[in-house]
Amino acid sequence: MLEMGRRVMVAGTFDIIHEGHIKMLWSAKSLAGDDGELVVVVARDENVRKYKKREPILEESIRAYIVKNLKPVDRVVLGERDPIESVLKLRPDVIALGYDQWADENWLREELLKRGLNVEIVRLPRFGDSSSSSIVRRVIKLFCSSE
């Protein structure tokens, strides 16, 4: 654990950064406290293919670079093949899950306890109406539809 604050971990694809991502990151940062740390795990390209069943729009190094340069973010790491491995390496005090992330809080808590980690798990609400997929649909509608 950090000296005064807490280490909060957030994980995601962060393919097209939008308002909801920024608000979610600020919310997660507030859980860390003044001297805490927000660590963002950016999904590997192979995990985007595996879990989202699609190609990433931007490659992992670009997504990590963009997230690293967002104000609330203290540190960025690329994820592991097994998402639990990232948690074991980072040893966060808190995992902040997005409203739409696949992980069930109880299952995740139990899996981590089996491995000796007692981590607080928080499910964050949806922030705004933006989503990466809605942005993609809008771009297709505006620029790819034949009229």
From Swiss-Prot:
One of its GO terms (biological process) is FMN metabolic process. It catalyses: FMN + ATP + H(+) = FAD + diphosphate. Its cofactor is a divalent metal cation. It comes from the Archaea. GO terms for molecular function: ATP binding; FMN adenylyltransferase activity. The keyword Nucleotide-binding applies. Pathway: Cofactor biosynthesis; FAD biosynthesis; FAD from FMN: step 1/1. InterPro entries: Archaeal_FAD_synthase, Cyt_trans-like, FAD_synth_RibL, Rossmann-like_a/b/a_fold. ATP binds at T13, F14, H18, E19, G20, H21, D100, F127. Keywords: ATP-binding, FAD, Flavoprotein, FMN, Nucleotide-binding, Nucleotidyltransferase, Transferase. Pfam families: CTP_transf_like. Transmembrane segments: none annotated. Its EC number is 2.7.7.2. Catalyzes the transfer of the AMP portion of ATP to flavin mononucleotide (FMN) to produce flavin adenine dinucleotide (FAD) coenzyme. NCBIfam families: cyt_tran_rel. Homodimer. Belongs to the archaeal FAD synthase family. This is FAD synthase. It comes from Korarchaeum cryptofilum (strain OPF8). The gene is ribL.
